[in-house]
Amino acid sequence: PIQMASQTWDDHDRSDRYLARDFGQNYLMSLQETGNPIIFTNGDNDTFPLWYNQETEGFRTDARTCNLSYLQTDWYIDQMKRPAYDSPSLPITWDRMEYVEGTNEYIPVQPDYKKSIDALYAEAEKQALNGNPEALVNVKKEFGENPYELQNILKYWVRSKNDDLKVIPTDSIVMKVDKEAVRRSGMMIPGDSIPDYMHISLKGKRALYKSELMMLEMLAEANWERPIYMAVSVGTENHLGMGNHFVQEGLTYRFTPFDTEKTGVKLDSEKMYDNLMNKFKFGGIDKEGIYIDENAMRM
């Protein structure tokens, strides 16, 4: 035991090192100060330090930490639909029976439906031109103005009472952009224009799971009025094909309607500089003699 203690003491010496707490604060400090932001996390190391800071130190209680691993469960969605401290409930409109365990665990992505839907709308438009406008009105009443728009897919397909319609009928979803909401949001606007639509690619995905459906629900319902972020530590497999719409502002990626592959702007340099130089804490690792283990180095 003496040999073990003498040879490995430094490996276990955490004195004056507050990296876990400070990095939790850094994630939260990366969020916009207004608007009750939401941050999606996924693992232990990017969730529990945030919860500690909010629950114990009362730090950024206006923000909501949402763990994607738990978002697959009904009890956690229940929690997210309730206010917590200074954070209002998350923008989820589903009734409990729509997400209770065993319901809507996943929804198949079936882009082969698109051909039939396009034909249905084309025929209805043809009938409308030939003096039967009710045909087009009825089709739009059943599937919406644009059947591939995010809110219509959630309303008329995913949440349909008809089990035959519980599919996502395209692998390319569009979301109409409220430009005034984007201008008010506080996000960086590259260039001088805001796109009319945001495009979400589901190519290669066979289904969307409940947690992913909840992400889309929140994105649609927040409508850029409430900032939504993804922790940088969340793997790309959980980005739901929206990585090209992320702009980094610190230890977080912000969801934006801009395609960064087209704008070339993937980083808000002003916010990043302010966070790194003026806000972030580094848990004492800048002090001489502090032991930095492999986990700290990775962070």
Q: Could you describe each region identified by the protein language model?
A:
Residues 1-36, 53-299:
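ER/secretory pathway lumenal C-terminal domains and tails of membrane proteins involved
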